[in-house]
């Protein structure tokens, strides 16, 4: 689940930065 959580966090950060 850690990988999924990390991916979700990265996607979230990407959306925020965008």
From Swiss-Prot:
Q: Which InterPro entries has this protein been placed in?
A: Antimicrobial13
Domain of life of the organism encoding this protein: Eukaryota
Indicate where this protein resides in the cell.
Secreted
Provide this UniProt record's keywords sorted from A to Z: Amidation, Antibiotic, Antimicrobial, Disulfide bond, Secreted
Tell me which GO cellular component terms the UniProt record holds. Answer: extracellular region
Gene Ontology biological process terms, A to Z: defense response to bacterium
Positions of post-translational Alanine amide modification: 18
Subunit info? Answer: Heterodimer with subunit B; disulfide-linked.
Q: What does this protein do?
A: Antimicrobial activity against S.aureus and P.aeruginosa, possibly by attacking the bacterial cell membrane.
Protein name from the UniProt record:
Halocidin subunit A
Species, as recorded: Halocynthia aurantium
